Amino acid sequence: VLRNHSKVKAWGLEHVPETGPFITAARHVTMYDVFVPMVSMFHQGRRPRYMAKAEMAKWPLIGKWFQLVGMQPVQRRAGKAKAIEETSVEILTSGRPLTVWPEGTVTRDPQKWPMSMKNGVGVIALESSRRLGCQVPLYCAVTWGAASINHWWPWPRKNVVMCYDEALDYADLLDGCDSWGDEVPTDRADELTRRIRVRMTEIMAEIRGEQAPDGYWDYRTMSRVKD
């Protein structure tokens, strides 16, 4: 699908660790852009688990493919967040990489900038780091151009770019982690999630050659809000 519809240029893949667990936090502008980090990781010889809504596993043909490449079904219902986070942490602490889309769904920002994100990515990164006793590498992957692929006709192929950024440092948020108790402090998970969104916005601005708007799009209010 990706090769038929697009010409992908990716940079920064040298940052992908050859071994061990790591987290890729990817942008979600369109349904097509989920394939870009998948293919990129495949060519790097890594096979992450992918957190994706459970309904995708039931899609004709492509659902079976998602399962084969490492899809981790997510039941997106109230009360399931803790179970999803625990499954993700277990994937990482077992030594496997994980890819997540922190926006939770295709962005609703009319201009396609990163919107509000669920702090589960922060919880997963911090808790897995605490259990492993070291900071789990976390990378932002930003794809742009896939939104122009809006039909199944493969020609003309669209240009798609992806930047796989350097590891995002969050060592300061792990200070005192041995005293957290049973749960990651919400303020720390929120802060790490904010850093991911801000960094994604910076990368997106560089790719697009534009200045990002003030604030970010809030999914709950469907409006732009200040940081």
Model-predicted regions and their roles:
Residues V16, Q111-E183, Y219:
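A cross-family acyltransferase "interaction/gating" segment
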Residues R208-D227:
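Short, highly charged C-terminal tails/helix-capping segments
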Residues V16-A78:
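Catalytic core of membrane glycerolipid acyltransferases/transacylases, capturing the structured
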Residues V1-K7, K58-V69, W153-R157:
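Alpha-helical membrane-targeting segments
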Residues P21-I23, P97-W101, P137:
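Residue-level preference for the first positions of well-ordered beta-strands
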Residues V1-G20:
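A short, well-structured juxtamembrane/interface segment
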Residues I91-G122:
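Catalytic-site beta-strand/loop segments enriched in glycine and acidic/polar residues
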Residues A171-W180, D187-A205:
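A conserved mid-domain beta-alpha-beta active-site/ligand-binding segment of alpha/beta enzyme cores
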